C-alpha cells in the first residue's frame, strides 16, 4: 500500500510541473488554427490569370509577439516576359525616393541575376505544389532598393530587391521545400511554364495578427 501511494506521489511530482510548464503564458493564444485545402484552392484560383501573385491566407498569432503566415504563391513562365514599363517623369521621381540597399556599384558583374529578394524580418518556407523551375539562392544584393511596404496581411514586410551576385541555382519541383532565413537572397531564374507553392512565414512584430484574406473571410 505504501509503495503504491509513493509511486502515485512520485508520478504526480513529475507530471504536475510538466503540466504547469506546458500551459500557454498569459496573453498568448490558447487555440489552434485550421486552414483548409478548399480555402487555399480558392485563393489560388484568383491568382492564376496573373504573372505573379503572392497572397497570405491568414496571419495567425502564435504568441510572444510572433505570427505565422500561410500563403499561396503563383508565378507564370519567365520565358514570356511582360513589356518593359514606360519611362517617364513619374518613374524617375519614384526611383529617386527609394532607399538604396545592398552593395552599390556602377558596373555589376555580367553574371548578376535580376530579381533578387531579401526580407528584413521574415523567414520563408516554400513547398512546391504545382509546376517548378530554377531558383537562385544566397550571394549578396547589388544595386538594391529597399521596400518599406508593410500591409496588414503582407505578404511580406520590409525587404531589399536588386541584382544577385554570387548566388547559385537550384531546381525545384513538386514536393520540394526551400527554407530562406531573413536577409538571404532568393528568386527565380527560369520558370518554363508556371510554379505554385505554399509559403510559411514566421515573423515578429511585422504582420497584423488575426488578418484573414478577404477571399476566404466569412461574410
Task: Briefly describe each language-model feature range.
Residues 115-118, 124-127, 169-170, 177-178:
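His/acidic/aromatic-lined binding-pocket segments of jelly-roll/cupin-type domains
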Residues 24-47, 51-52, 107, 146-151, ...:
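Double-stranded beta-helix
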Residues 8-19:
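Bacterial N-terminal signal peptides
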Amino acid at each position: 500500500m505504501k509503495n503504491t501511494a509513493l509511486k502515485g506521489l512520485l508520478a504526480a511530482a513529475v507530471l504536475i510541473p510538466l503540466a504547469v510548464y506546458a500551459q500557454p503564458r498569459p496573453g498568448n493564444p490558447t487555440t489552434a488554427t485550421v486552414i483548409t485545402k478548399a480555402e487555399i484552392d480558392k485563393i489560388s484560383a484568383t491568382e492564376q490569370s496573373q504573372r505573379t501573385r503572392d497572397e497570405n491566407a491568414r496571419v495567425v498569432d502564435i504568441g510572444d509577439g510572433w505570427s505565422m503566415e500561410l500563403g499561396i504563391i503563383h508565378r507564370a513562365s519567365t520565358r514570356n516576359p511582360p513589356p518593359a514599363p514606360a519611362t517617364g517623369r513619374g518613374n524617375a521621381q519614384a526611383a529617386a525616393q527609394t532607399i538604396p540597399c545592398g552593395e552599390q556599384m556602377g558596373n555589376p558583374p555580367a553574371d548578376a541575376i535580376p530579381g533578387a529578394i531579401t526580407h528584413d524580418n521574415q523567414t520563408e518556407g516554400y513547398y512546391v505544389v504545382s509546376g517548378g523551375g530554377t531558383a537562385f539562392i544566397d550571394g549578396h544584393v547589388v544595386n538594391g532598393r529597399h521596400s518599406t511596404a508593410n500591409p496588414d496581411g503582407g505578404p511580406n514586410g520590409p525587404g531589399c530587391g536588386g541584382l544577385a551576385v554570387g548566388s547559385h541555382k537550384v531546381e525545384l519541383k513538386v514536393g520540394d521545400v526551400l527554407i530562406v532565413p531573413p536577409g538571404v537572397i532568393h528568386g527565380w531564374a527560369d520558370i518554363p511554364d508556371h510554379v505554385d507553392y505554399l509559403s510559411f512565414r514566421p515573423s515578429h512584430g511585422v504582420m497584423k495578427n488575426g488578418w484573414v484574406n478577404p477571399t476566404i473571410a466569412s461574410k
